[in-house]
């Protein structure tokens, strides 16, 4: 284990304590969870600030539970990649148990009925909170649960709401349900999914008004802002780890399309702010760098990142990188035109409308993104990853800034003067053709709405003369563009 940082606590004792008196349950067993929340829990254990770890559960890609957790005795290897080429390797043992939502409802019920339980966190990805299709019809499994009540739920949010209901009926303290997903208003999205389910049950006579009140008003849904680039596992890192003697280091892709490995690789910079709304207490996260603060500060921090200082550039580098044949974000940062695009997009158009949270300096944050994080050659992030699910990201990443320009009274801040934001939006439409700048077809990144948005555009081909009228059905579609498009 030379060169590896090992757990500095009694792993067996932590597992026993957590099984008997769990405090933290997490849904979503992917790479971000292993690289960030699990490491935070390890820091608390190492410092003696906690004697329990995290129990994780996955309901989307349960193959991860078998291959990344149970096969490794719930030990995970976290590799931190610094811009100077330094690599830090740490064995993380804070995850004490892993569960499958489809098989382990009895164990999950036991956990929810533990008086010690304080918080439930989530990394579901942005699309994980979607409960309705583009016609506002509820998705089939969600609709089934709304109509049939808490027994025999099929959907993730049906099962989650039913578990919270069990805790309510046992007379136990409410919980904080904390979304740690990289999207705006993440806590509100989580609350909305639970509210739609609980209201349907209340109206259908399955639960009482008091139970509905507990689910939505006693439980809390704090907002958070999370930031830590965690790309797919890198084969170069796998080779280094295999040379150290790590078995089965080669990355794999699950049947659901998740890129995973027995290790995770991520960058060093990280940020996490959580709204201070914990009805039953919380782990001492503030002792390891997490900012627990007012809701408005979290909102401004999230808006700063999602709408100004990072996520819009993610989209720009994603769609243009795919069309230009790049496979690494760090290589894109050697392209003067792309650097010019994201620099002007952020500094000239986004920053004038930035929300300043007061606890993070937007200028310093942006400088770190442009000068250190994106150019990091050892962090093999790809435009193909950042272009994933772009149809879900256009409105939150560009809408806030565009609204600010539309509402501005200053002549210098007119939406009609914008250049780079419209260019990125146009770039996404061009990307949807699936043809690069050499005229060769490329595979579009996963996005549940690809076929629909292409159909709304009329499926144009490279070189076609596309009119505004042809694009109008997509640009005017509120599901994708909210109110971004005006004639």
Residue ranges with predicted function:
Residues 1-27, 31-487:
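Substrate/ligand-engaging "lid" and interaction regions
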């Amino acid at each position: 284990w030379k060169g590896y940082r090992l757990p500095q606590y009694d792993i067996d004792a932590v597992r026993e304590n957590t099984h008997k008196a769990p405090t933290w349950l997490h849904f979503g067993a992917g790479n971000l969870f292993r690289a960030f929340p699990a490491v935070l829990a390890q820091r608390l254990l190492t410092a003696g600030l906690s004697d329990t770890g995290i129990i994780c559960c996955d309901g989307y890609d349960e193959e991860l539970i078998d291959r990344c957790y149970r096969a490794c005795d719930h030990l995970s290897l976290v590799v931190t990649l610094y811009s100077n080429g330094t690599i830090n390797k740490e064995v993380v043992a804070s995850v004490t148990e892993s569960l499958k939502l489809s098989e382990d409802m009895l164990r999950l019920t036991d956990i929810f009925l533990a008086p010690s339980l304080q918080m439930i966190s989530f990394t579901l990805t942005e699309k994980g909170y979607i409960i309705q299709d583009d016609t506002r019809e509820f998705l089939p499994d969600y609709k089934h649960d709304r109509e049939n009540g808490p027994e025999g739920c099929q959907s993730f949010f049906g099962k989650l709401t039913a578990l919270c209901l069990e805790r309510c009926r046992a007379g136990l303290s409410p919980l904080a349900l904390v979304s740690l997903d990289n999207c705006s208003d993440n806590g509100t999205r989580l609350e909305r999914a639970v509210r739609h389910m609980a209201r349907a049950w209340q109206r259908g006579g399955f639960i009482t008004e008091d139970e509905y009140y507990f689910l939505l008003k006693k439980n809390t849904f704090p907002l958070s802002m999370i930031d830590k680039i965690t790309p797919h596992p890198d084969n170069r890192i796998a080779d280094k780890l295999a040379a150290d003697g790590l078995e089965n280091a080669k990355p794999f892709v699950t049947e659901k399309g998740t890129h995973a490995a027995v290790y995770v690789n991520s960058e060093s910079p990280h940020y996490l702010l959580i709204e201070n709304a914990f009805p039953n207490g919380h782990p001492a996260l503030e002792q390891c760098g997490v900012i627990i603060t007012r809701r408005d500060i979290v909102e401004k921090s999230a808006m700063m990142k999602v709408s100004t200082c990072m996520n819009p550039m993610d989209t720009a580098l994603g769609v243009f990188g795919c069309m230009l044949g790049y496979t690494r974000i760090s290589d894109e940062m050697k392209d003067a035109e792309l650097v010019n695009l994201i620099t002007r997009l952020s500094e000239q158009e986004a920053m004038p409308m930035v929300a300043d949270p007061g606890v993070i300096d937007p200028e310093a944050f942006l400088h770190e993104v442009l000068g250190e994080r994106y150019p990091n050659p050892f962090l093999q992030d790809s435009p193909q990853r950042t272009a994933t699910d772009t149809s879900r990201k256009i409105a939150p990443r560009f809408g806030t800034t565009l609204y600010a320009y539309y509402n501005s009274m200053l002549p210098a801040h007119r939406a009609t003067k914008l250049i780079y934001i419209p260019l990125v939006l146009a770039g996404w439409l061009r990307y949807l053709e699936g043809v690069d700048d050499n005229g060769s077809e490329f595979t579009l990144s996963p996005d549940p709405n690809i076929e629909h948005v292409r159909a709304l555009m009329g499926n144009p081909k490279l070189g076609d003369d596309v009119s505004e009228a042809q694009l109008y059905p997509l640009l005017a579609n509120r599901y994708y563009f909210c109110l971004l498009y005006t004639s």
